[in-house]
Design a protein with these regions (language model features):
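Glycine-rich active-site loops that engage anionic ligands at enzyme catalytic sites
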Residues: 108-150
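Active-site/ligand-binding surface loops and adjacent short beta/alpha elements
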Residues: 39-44, 51-126
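Short, well-ordered beta-strand segments enriched in hydrophobic/aromatic residues
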Residues: 20, 27-35, 166
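Surface-exposed, gly/pro-biased binding rims or lids
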Residues: 65-84, 131-132, 139-161
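Exposed beta-sheet edge/beta-hairpin loop segments within beta-rich domains
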Residues: 9-12, 21, 158-168
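Hydrophobic residues positioned within well-ordered beta-strands of beta-sheet architectures
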Residues: 16-18, 29, 46-48, 150, ...
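Short Pro-Gly-centered flexible turn/kink motifs
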Residues: 31, 162-177
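Extended, loop-rich substrate-binding clefts of extracytoplasmic carbohydrate-active enzymes
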Residues: 1-24
Length: 177
């Protein structure tokens, strides 16, 4: 909502809609941002912080990232190319994968199931786990919780969305078990 409070943090008129649809085995996320200004362009980044509960993060596999370049935030933002067919996490991980596939499969999610992540207009995918050393630094994160979670986050983070006056941006994500 565009109001005095939001203007104190970000001085642009805007309209944001966020719609969630829950179905039996699916969760849909739809987000829209509209720039009602007649004169001003603005830019922003967007990331859906999706935390998945897993039995053991070391046994999870993520598809749809092979061949993508990624920014490794654990290694001074160096850029690498992903050579693995499936990505696994066995250490502190904070990566921004760029120009990723519109679908990822995450294996060994809750009860050993697969989670399908389908995304539209989110070119980036962040894979994150704080591991033991970083989990201690997060106040609302238990020191022993890192093995039971993984973040696979759809976003528009490596380059901003630029909204010209009177234009809109829409993106969506569907999670399926």
């Amino acid at each position: 909502m565009d109001n005095e409070f939001t203007r104190s943090m970000w001085n642009y008129p805007f309209k944001l809609t966020y719609r969630l649809i829950l179905r039996e085995k699916e969760l849909h996320f739809n987000i829209g941002v509209y720039n009602p200004s007649k004169d001003h362009t603005f830019s922003f980044n967007l990331l859906l912080h999706t935390y998945f509960k897993v039995p053991d993060v070391r046994r999870c596999q993520i598809t749809g990232l092979h061949g993508c370049t990624f920014i490794d935030k654990t290694r001074d933002n160096q850029i690498f190319q992903e050579g693995r067919d499936v990505v696994t996490v066995c250490e502190w991980t904070d990566r921004i994968y760029q120009n990723t596939q519109p679908e990822h499969i995450i294996t060994n999610v809750v009860s050993g199931r697969k989670m399908r992540v389908q995304k539209y207009n989110f070119p980036d995918t962040v894979v994150w786990n704080p591991w033991q050393e970083k989990a201690r630094d997060i106040p609302d994160f238990g020191d022993d919780e890192f093995p039971n979670m993984i973040c696979v986050e759809s976003g528009h983070v490596s380059s901003p969305v630029i909204l010209l006056p009177g234009t809109a941006f829409e993106a969506s994500q569907i999670l399926q078990v």
